[in-house]
Design a protein with these regions (language model features):
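Beta-sheet ligand-binding and adhesion/scaffold domains
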Residues: 1-2, 67-132
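Ser/Thr- (and often Asn-) enriched beta-sheet segments in non-cytosolic proteins
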Residues: 11-15, 30-34, 106, 111
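Short, conserved turn/kink motifs that form compact alpha/beta structural patches or helix kinks used as
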Residues: 56-64, 71-73
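Polar/charged side chains located within well-ordered beta-strands of beta-rich proteins
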Residues: 14, 31, 43, 85, ...
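Short, solvent-exposed secondary-structure boundary motifs
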Residues: 15-27, 44-50, 71-77
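N-terminal glycine/threonine-rich, aromatic-flanked beta-hairpin/loop signature
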Residues: 24-59
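Short, hydrophobic/aromatic-rich segments at coil-to-beta transitions
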Residues: 7-13, 38-42, 63-69
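Tryptophan-anchored aromatic micro-motifs
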Residues: 1-25, 133
Length: 133
């Protein structure tokens, strides 16, 4: 699979593990990110909306690799979080370094695949309009 020109209009399932001083974030070990536009996405897990209105930047580098940077308002209860992801489309992997307030917080190591866009949970499902990641 070649790196995509854009993520807009796609939904991507992520399965993997997070490594942090607090252990894995099991509530999001499998989640789907739906890219509504070229700079906004939302995240669902277990049929619940876990992040909404998340800003992101995507840059395809070549036929295989892309950089993806997420800026959620809240992530695992923390603000000031930025996720720096390296997407390898040939291996279908996503590896990220996650900073909180500019300091190392966690890493994420997972696989990715495009999936049909899941039904968007309503504002009263899951965490509602709470933003996170």
């Amino acid at each position: 699979v070649e790196a995509w020109e854009t993520l807009a209009g796609r939904s991507v399932e992520w399965k993997g593990v997070h490594h942090s001083m607090h252990g894995d974030f099991r509530d999001i070990s499998t989640h789907t990110v739906t890219y509504e536009s070229r700079d906004r996405c939302y995240v669902t897990a277990d049929g619940k909306l876990v992040a909404d209105g998340v800003g992101y930047t995507y840059q395809k580098l070549d036929h295989r690799m892309a950089i993806l940077i997420y800026r959620p308002e809240v992530y695992q209860g923390r603000s000031g979080v930025v996720l720096y992801s390296m997407l390898d489309f040939a291996r279908a992997t996503d590896r990220a370094v996650i900073l909180a307030d500019g300091e190392p917080f966690a890493v994420a190591d997972g696989t990715i695949r495009e999936v049909p866009t899941p039904a968007r949970p309503g504002p009263n499902d899951g965490f509602g309009r709470r933003r996170g990641g």
